[in-house]
Amino acid sequence: MKALCDRFVPQQCSSSSKSDTHDKSPLVSDSGPSDNKSKFTLWSNVFTSSSSVSQPYRESSTSGHKQVCTTRNGWTAFVKRVSMASGAIRRFQERVLGPNRTGLPSTTSDVWLLGVCYKISADENSGETDTGTVLAALQLDFSSKILMTYRKGFEPFRDTTYTSDVNWGCMIRSSQMLFAQALLFHRLGRAWTKKSELPEQEYLETLEPFGDSEPSAFSIHNLIIAGASYGLAAGSWVGPYAICRAWESLACKKRKQTDSKNQTLPMAVHIVSGSEDGERGGAPILCIEDATKSCLEFSKGQSEWTPIILLVPLVLGLDSVNPRYIPSLVATFTFPQSVGILGGKPGASTYIVGVQEDKGFYLDPHEVQQVVTVNKETPDVDTSSYHCNVLRYVPLESLDPSLALGFYCRDKDDFDDFCLRALKLAEESNGAPLFTVTQTHTAINQSNYGFADDDSEDEREDDWQML
């Protein structure tokens, strides 16, 4: 069945060209007193991108008319077209995602990026060299995250004429980013960053299955096929719950086709939901017994524990995220197991990879790029379209309440550490946990019975809708 969260979103999402990505973007937000801007001139040169400009997506023209303008007039016309296109795209993005906020919203608060803390300080006593080192490390880390965007020019989907996912594929692309990041963590570790020289084979092997064709294991084509029973279809937007289930189905299919030692996705996929198939209200429950079962199924009974990715689809309110959940959302990025959040504005999904205070830093899939074929046999392939240098942020309170958390646990010790952190987070949530943790289904049933006459439980669940 479809999640309740999916009813909040329209059927299409929006697109933009790459020109927005290639604008200069200061690390510090433009808002704030002017003396702060002059004081921290170092920050203005970080997170800038190349100066190339690309046009917004459109079908190629079949016209064969020759150019008749002079070089000067041709350049003038080109500048006018770029200016008009950039302005239209900027206004369009502001309507969908809100004002284009770039850089760092604060010069003093720590930044958390998928479990790693960057201590940003603007104190008089802090040296500029130290600040510059931190900013450079943050820039390198962010720009090393995998970006998946709209693509054009791939083979049509089955029984359709779609050769691009423009205007509807953003949630699928966001989910591809999350899984690609989990694979990078698995193969190369959290400390890995993109090198300027030829890429590592493990890096290329990570990108290869996300190609835009059916032979690619995690392509948009195969996700749509795997998620058909959850409403995935070419041309239609999809919500967080449905895409999580699509990944679960795709992982199960690939597991059955391949032996455990040669899995394209070398980890179990486990979705955290409510007890008794969601019949009880309240926060979703991570049952350790069920997670262990997922690992056993993935290894086909050969191992009691394997790497695992946990997906937690949530609905944190009605029209917007209830503010009482925001501190917990922020805290999840301090977990070393965090692989981010699938979320954004209604009908416009993004991949949130970090936070500063109550702002979320995200990678935006709403850019249209040509299909690129990446594999380990072509180490010199240009993979720049899979990365972004522009740090964008969105207030967490403005997110659509339908979202999904992601966590990757490398082994049993890592999973145990995650459970301890999750339990502590639930205890400190003031009665509004994102999700809870229990050992067995017996404990869940006892909890259900114990809460039967508890008025505070009803109050705690007012904003919850189970998936």
From Swiss-Prot:
It comes from the Eukaryota. It comes from Arabidopsis thaliana. SUPFAM superfamilies: Cysteine proteinases. GO terms for molecular function: cysteine-type peptidase activity; endopeptidase activity; protein-phosphatidylethanolamide deconjugating activity. Residues 1-35, 448-467 are annotated as: Disordered. Cysteine protease that plays a key role in autophagy by mediating both proteolytic activation and delipidation of ATG8 family proteins. The protease activity is required for proteolytic activation of ATG8 family proteins: cleaves the C-terminal amino acid of ATG8 proteins to reveal a C-terminal glycine. Exposure of the glycine at the C-terminus is essential for ATG8 proteins conjugation to phosphatidylethanolamine (PE) and insertion to membranes, which is necessary for autophagy. In addition to the protease activity, also mediates delipidation of PE-conjugated ATG8 proteins. Interacts with ATG8. Residues 452-467 have a biased composition (Acidic residues). It catalyses: [protein]-C-terminal L-amino acid-glycyl-phosphatidylethanolamide + H2O = [protein]-C-terminal L-amino acid-glycine + a 1,2-diacyl-sn-glycero-3-phosphoethanolamine. Transmembrane segments: none annotated. Belongs to the peptidase C54 family. It is found in: Cytoplasm. This is Cysteine protease ATG4a. It is an enzyme of class 3 (hydrolase). Its EC number is 3.4.22.-. Pfam families: Peptidase_C54. GO terms for biological process: autophagy; protein transport; proteolysis.
